Every structure is written in structure tokens, then in C-alpha cells.
Design a protein with these regions (language model features):
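Short, basic/glycine-rich phosphate-binding loops at helix/coil junctions
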Residues: 63-80
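Short aromatic-enriched loop/helix-cap "lid" or pocket-rim segments at secondary-structure transitions
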Residues: 38-44, 123, 168-173
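Phosphate-coordination/substrate-recognition cap region in phosphate-metabolizing enzymes
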Residues: 1-68
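Active-site-adjacent alpha-helix immediately C-terminal to a catalytic or transition-state-stabilizing loop
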Residues: 11, 24, 92-154
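Surface-exposed cleft-lining segments at the edges of enzyme active sites
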Residues: 75-91
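Acidic, His/Gly-rich catalytic cores of divalent-metal-dependent hydrolytic chemistry
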Residues: 155-178
Length: 178
């Protein structure tokens, strides 16, 4: 079975995978696999975080540092403004998607999602704090894959952020980040 978020990039990624593998599989969409709205999180920063707001428009290094701080504030419910969803609502949304996927029994499942939900999955498997999800999210590579072993009662991380299909001497610039 294949589960994807409802974002256009999720469908595009699934289609590219299917084209490359010669597969033709139906996709089950689940909004629980969608990324958080990082633009809205920056916009929700209160006046006490004005300098941090500017990092949303900086170069990628400035943006990365700013996003990491914004995610930490979000996870602590300290943005200062109103976000589309709280950190806890985001985690609960992702967890509902994970529980739906876990009901697939012994089937192999492909999930196409985004960095935030992927990091939350890993955090849940590791039973780690919110700060771990943020740290994991910030190191995810584009087009990486993670592998989990799961059933209705257990959820275990087997590999994280793997890119053997990109980590080639002949393609030194193929590994990119968010």
C-alpha cells in the first residue's frame, strides 16, 4: 500500500518513484502526512521575536537557524501569536496518520511525506522528546528514506535519512537539504 500527504509535492514524488520503478499503484492520501506551515509559524511570532521573523527571508543558512528556533518556540507554545495548529495538534495529526498506517498489518507500506512528519515518526519510534524531532527534522536530506518495522502494538525505527541512491562519487552534488 502507498500513503501520501495531500500536498502536490507528495504526489509528484510518488509519481516519480513509480515511473522510475515501473510501478502502477494507487495512493491513499492522508493530510496527517502533510508538513507544518513554516511560513505561518514565522508569521505567528510575537513582537518579542521581531528579529527572528527576519530570518524567514534570509539566505538558507540564516533561514535554517531561524527555523530551528521557531520550531523550538512552537514546541514550547511560546511563538507569541496564533499558528494554524499547535505543536501538540501537529504531533497528534501525524500520530493519527501513523496509527492508520499501522493498521495495515503485515503489509509492506510506502509513505511519501515531508520532513516534519518524518521527524515526528522517528521521534515516536525512539520515544524521544520534542527537541529530538526538531533536531531530526533539521538534518533530513531531500529524497532520503527511513525504514520502520511496525504492527498494531509496536513501532521501531530500522534506518533513518538514508540516501544510497544519491550518495555516489559520480553525483557529488545530488544530496540536498530541505
Amino acid at each position: 500500500r502507498v500513503f501520501i500527504g495531500t500536498l502536490r509535492r507528495h504526489r509528484q514524488t510518488a509519481e516519480a518513484l513509480f515511473d522510475g520503478a515501473g510501478w502502477s499503484l494507487p495512493c491513499e492520501e492522508d493530510a496527517g502526512l502533510n508538513e507544518y506551515d513554516f511560513h505561518a509559524l514565522f508569521a505567528a511570532l510575537g513582537s518579542e521575536h521581531e528579529s527572528l521573523k527576519a530570518s524567514a527571508h534570509g539566505d538558507r543558512h540564516v533561514f535554517y537557524r531561524g527555523l530551528k528556533q521557531v520550531l523550538q518556540l512552537w514546541s514550547e507554545d511560546r511563538l507569541g501569536g496564533v499558528a494554524p495548529e499547535t505543536w501538540n495538534q501537529f504531533v497528534e495529526r501525524v500520530d493519527r496518520a501513523r496509527q492508520r498506517i499501522a493498521r495495515c498489518g503485515g503489509q509492506r507500506v510506502l509513505v511519501v511525506s515531508s520532513g516534519g512528519p518524518i521527524a515526528v515518526f522517528a521521534r515516536q519510534a525512539l520515544q524521544a522528546p520534542a527537541s529530538a524531532a526538531i533536531a531530526l527534522n533539521m538534518q533530513l536530506r531531500n529524497a532520503s528514506f527511513c525504514q520502520y518495522f511496525f504492527n498494531r502494538d509496536a513501532f521501531h525505527l530500522a534506518s533513518f535519512n538514508s540516501v544510497p541512491h544519491l550518495d555516489l562519487v559520480s553525483r557529488p552534488n545530488s544530496i540536498t537539504y530541505g
